[in-house]
């Protein structure tokens, strides 16, 4: 179920302050975050975030197409190794 429009997008408060500090400094450094649930806002465009996936920080460069999505969508938590091979076909 989608979030109510009258509530607005959810963003952790510390994330806004971190992004503001990086914008003011002018340096293009990776902002490490653990908040996968936060929504990407227009003021984050052009910044690079290190989104934690449970084991490491995955670098995510934000562009205009990502606005409105969550940070967690761009940092996969599971590694897919493919389906198991058919053992009968392997023996022959």
Swiss-Prot record:
One of its GO terms (cellular component) is small ribosomal subunit. Belongs to the universal ribosomal protein uS19 family. HAMAP family: Ribosomal_uS19. Pfam families: Ribosomal_S19. GO terms for molecular function: rRNA binding; structural constituent of ribosome. InterPro entries: Ribosomal_uS19 (IPR002222), Ribosomal_uS19_bac-type (IPR005732), Ribosomal_uS19_CS (IPR020934), Ribosomal_uS19_SF (IPR023575). It comes from Agrobacterium fabrum (strain C58 / ATCC 33970). The lineage of its organism: Bacteria, Pseudomonadati, Pseudomonadota, Alphaproteobacteria, Hyphomicrobiales. GO terms for biological process: ribosomal small subunit assembly; translation. Keywords: Ribonucleoprotein, Ribosomal protein, RNA-binding, rRNA-binding. This is Small ribosomal subunit protein uS19. Protein S19 forms a complex with S13 that binds strongly to the 16S ribosomal RNA.
């Amino acid at each position: 179920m989608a979030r109510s429009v009258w509530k607005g997008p959810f963003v952790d408060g510390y994330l806004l302050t971190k992004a503001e500090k990086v914008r003011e400094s002018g340096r293009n450094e990776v902002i490490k975050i653990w908040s996968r649930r936060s929504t990407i806002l227009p003021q984050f465009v052009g910044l690079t975030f290190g989104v934690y996936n449970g084991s490491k920080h995955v670098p995510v460069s934000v562009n205009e197409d990502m606005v409105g999505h969550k940070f967690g969508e761009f940092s996969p938590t599971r590694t897919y190794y493919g389906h198991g091979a058919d053992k009968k076909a392997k023996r022959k």
